Every structure is written in C-alpha cells, then in structure tokens.
C-alpha cells in the first residue's frame, strides 16, 4: 500500500504542478502577456482553402507535381495565396499521394 500511495502522490503532484503552470500560462495569454507555455501565440490562425482554391491547386497538381518558382508565384497571385502556402500545399499533396501509393501497394 505504501508503494501504491507514493506512486499516486507522484502522479498527483505532477498533475497539480502541470495544472498550475498551464492555468497560469492561459491567464497570461488571455491578458496578452507572452509565456513559455503559450507556444501557439506566434502562429497564425489556420485558414482552410476555399473550394475554388483547392480545385485549382488539384488541377495544377495533376498537370505538374513540382512547380517552378515563377509558376508558384503565378498560382499564388491568381488564388490570392502566399507563395509559401502554395509551396506547402504541394509538399503536403505529394506526401498524400505517396501514402496513397504505399497503401495500394501493401494492402
């Protein structure tokens, strides 16, 4: 019973410690203060692509899996996206295709 109590106390202590610091991080974030626990504060909010943007990106991907920088800039301008968004979309799409091919080859 003593060993059981010690293990539980350690778990509970860790939980309390984590909860206190997590809550403090949340409070500071709500007040607008930077905190080491609020790593997401520097990230932009996720914005899903519109159906039109996705359709155009998919069409371009079917035509060419790899884009030149000029083409990437052109697509970004046409779809009102950043060059980085287009670049990452194509990277993610290539990985998706790779996973699909792997799943088909090894059912």
Curated annotation (Swiss-Prot):
Q: Where in the cell is it found?
A: Nucleus
Q: Which GO terms describe its molecular function?
A: DNA-binding transcription factor activity, RNA polymerase II-specific; RNA polymerase II cis-regulatory region sequence-specific DNA binding
Q: Which residues form a coiled coil?
A: none
Which ranges of the sequence are annotated as binding DNA? 42-101
What the entry lists under PROSITE patterns is as follows:
HOMEOBOX_1, HOMEOBOX_2
Q: Which CDD domains match?
A: homeodomain (cd00086)
Record's InterPro entries?
Answer: HD (IPR001356), HD_metazoa (IPR020479), Homeobox_CS (IPR017970), Homeodomain-like_sf (IPR009057), HXA10/ABDB-like (IPR046333)
UniProt KW keywords: Developmental protein, DNA-binding, Homeobox, Nucleus
Cystines in this chain? none
Q: Per the record, GO CC terms?
A: nucleus
One Pfam family, please name it: Homeodomain
Family under the similarity heading: Belongs to the Abd-B homeobox family.
* Protein name as it appears in the record: Homeobox protein HB4
Species the sequence originates in = Tripneustes gratilla
Q: What is the lineage of its organism?
A: Eukaryota, Metazoa, Echinodermata, Eleutherozoa, Echinozoa
């Amino acid at each position: 019973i003593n060993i059981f109590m010690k293990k539980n106390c350690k778990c509970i202590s860790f939980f309390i410690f984590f909860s206190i610091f997590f809550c403090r991080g949340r409070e500071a974030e709500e007040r607008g203060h930077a905190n080491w626990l609020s790593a997401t504060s520097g990230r932009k909010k996720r914005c899903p692509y519109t159906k039109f943007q996705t359709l155009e990106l998919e069409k371009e991907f079917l035509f060419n899996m790899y884009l030149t920088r000029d083409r990437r800039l052109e697509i970004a301008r046409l779809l009102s996206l950043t060059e980085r968004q287009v670049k990452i979309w194509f990277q993610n799409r290539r990985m998706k295709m790779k996973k699909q091919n792997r799943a088909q080859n090894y059912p």
